[in-house]
Amino acid sequence: MMLVAALASGQTVSDALTFGQNNYYGTARTLGMGNAVTAIGGDLGSISINPAGGSVSAFSQFEFSTGWNTANSISSYSPSYDSANQSANYSGGFENGKTRMTMPNIGMNLCFETGNRSGILSWNFAFVMNRSQSYNQIFSASGLENHTSMTGALATFAAGMPGTIITDNNRFDSDYAWNSICAYDVGLINFNKDALSYYGSAETVTKTGTDYSYEMLGVLKQNMGITSRGSKNDVVMNYGMNIDNRLFLGVNINLPVAGYKYSEYYNESAQDPADFPVTSGYYTKDNTGNLSYVQGKPTNYLGSTYKYSYVADISGINAQIGFIWLPTDGVRIGAAFKTPTAYTVSEEWYVDMNAEFQDASENHNASSPTAETSYNFRSPYTANFGLAYTVGRHGLLSVDYELTDYSVMKFSQEYVDASFTYEDPFYRVNRLNKLFCGLQQNLRVGAEFRLLPSFSLRAGFSLATSPERHYSDNEGYIIYASDYDRWFDDYESGKYSLVASEYNPDKIVSFSFGAGYSSPGSFYADVAFRRTKLPDNYYSPYSNYLSHTVGGTVYDIVSPSVKSALSQFDAVLTLGWRF
């Protein structure tokens, strides 16, 4: 997955996948078996995958799970490069890790026997909370850069913003990006009134005739990183029934809730401040409202820091149905279907910047207000299919196949006045979701071996494909979602067209193992460990803003980026009582 630092507010394909994807936790038993439990059931963790799992138990139970999640990363840095004849050159091994305590499961399942000899033998009601995603992640890297800078990117993307906006007390209520406004406030970008353009404080201004050019002449040390935390949990109300100990049916009303916190930082510092001379340029307003253009004292740029913080609170509702059928004593077949989730997302975000110069009187810092917004989001539907074989009370082998269609993800406004005609603010991102997201396939395999009547060992494996895809276009270029977004109008108008699609080769691979103890009485305990290898993450602190033409073809100077190898380790302990 490729991430670019947020230079403006707005929803993205990455947001849709963050909110829509699941990575099941549940209990230590289900985790230890790789969550290949669609045809197994009998455990509170399995209810979130197949609602029929709650009706398999012949007894009532209460259980809770606790543990920890560790996110690890090994990152490398690549400076900018000319896409005409170069490629990324990653180096360095920056290791990061973060551990958080978790409570992935708690709940109760009540079983009621009917007394019938045939037909419906029992029914159950369960109230459970199962974790379905962890947002724990951290990575960072640093390196030297001598072609591009955050200040240059901010100056480029400020094009069209009036130089007088700095004098407007309501400037954050305008349509201009808050990054650009804050950068102008602190002096990271400056306004050239003669050229009617902005230049970065890390750039040298050259005038040739009536033309101006801006370039970076020195070397910057760049430091950057991302931290995220939070989780998504499904609050489940489950009802099921047991028919002749051969057919188990179940239905869920799921109420997923999530808290997601994300922050990114970027710092750049001049290796030799003498290479970065700068004279600020901006407008001021006196007490009578008269505007005047001011040029500051010549100084040298030392460095700057950029921070972006984002918080989202998410709640939703979906329905789920499933069955488990035993055609013979050893064979079990299961299937479940979950409707798309209707989410409400409430989010807050802000940016913070500071700039330092050799003349300390030019140093400034600025923060945007905290933006608040809410909207609706529709997540994908999910279908699960399972086949299992049990060997009496000695063990079992289970295989699951899960299919999720991410192309149906959709953002929408929370409140719409039907009496007004308006432009859909989410049309662009919804179009990208439909084109560049598709089917994700997930294969899960699990096994359980009962070594003693009271002791079992478990192992599991899962492999999930990427739901993201890319295209080749009529010009022969490979087009990702970010490319289509950049040239959106050209593709939508038919100037360019997409020809053929191919899914990204990224995979999510997990291995797990565990053990379980079941006492002769009511108590039982399970423990499980899982290691997950996530797709490599590519992050750029700012978008490409320089380019040149060779033989009629435009080539970007690709901005610096960080490549991170990501993994997670989970440990879960489940304690339960039957009654």
Which residue ranges define each predicted feature?
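N-terminal signal peptide c-region/cleavage motif recognized by signal peptidases
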Residues: 5-9
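Short, solvent-exposed helix-helix connector turns and helix-capping sites enriched
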Residues: 49-50, 359
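Sec-dependent signal peptide recognition
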Residues: 1-2
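Outer-membrane beta-barrel porins/channels
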Residues: 11-25, 30, 111-579
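Outer-membrane beta-barrel translocator/receptor signature
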Residues: 28, 40-49, 55-145, 233
